[in-house]
């Protein structure tokens, strides 16, 4: 059975970064949870990570990233590169089906099991079932308003929740 879940969105503006995620988890054609927490603060609260995909896989990858952050003293870019290498090369990790979105004060990264580490051109990044909707809304708000990063995340996730059937309006938002 296919699990569909998640919209995760990150926006940086005026030195603040907000990352938000919805709480819906869908199994087949049924919503089985409304308040899942898909974002976490790592490394002494200096990094925020969200995942899209399998919950077990996403949480396992978050744990791996946290270990890499400890190893590289909070350097998100180095930790992400090493995680992506391991994810791509390790027989067990290769099977994990999730995407990570990770941010600190300097970087905003999408990390995949294909070895991708993508930093967007603009300070807006989204993953998950409703990611494209949230990203489009966030870019429009970022380019055309003076809203804060948090306000853009809230409004964009709300728009995504009105379009994507796999996204609800029970948001968790973290800021650094």
Swiss-Prot record:
Keywords: Allosteric enzyme, Cytoplasm, Hydrolase, Metal-binding, Protease, Sodium, Threonine protease
Keyword Iron: no
Pfam family, one: Proteasome
Subcellular location: Cytoplasm
Record-linked InterPro entries: ATP-dep_Prtase_HsIV_su, Ntn_hydrolases_N, Proteasome_sua/b, Proteasome_suB-type
Activity regulation (UniProt): Allosterically activated by HslU binding.
Annotated binding of Na(+), by residue: 161, 164, 167
One MF term in the entry's GO annotations: threonine-type endopeptidase activity
Keyword Metal-binding attached: yes
Family note: Belongs to the peptidase T1B family. HslV subfamily.
NCBIfam families, A to Z: ATP_dep_HslV (TIGR03692), PRK05456.1 (NF003964)
Quaternary structure (record): A double ring-shaped homohexamer of HslV is capped on each side by a ring-shaped HslU homohexamer. The assembly of the HslU/HslV complex is dependent on binding of ATP.
HAMAP family per the UniProt record, alphabetical: HslV
Protein name: ATP-dependent protease subunit HslV
Organism encoding this protein: Aquifex aeolicus (strain VF5)
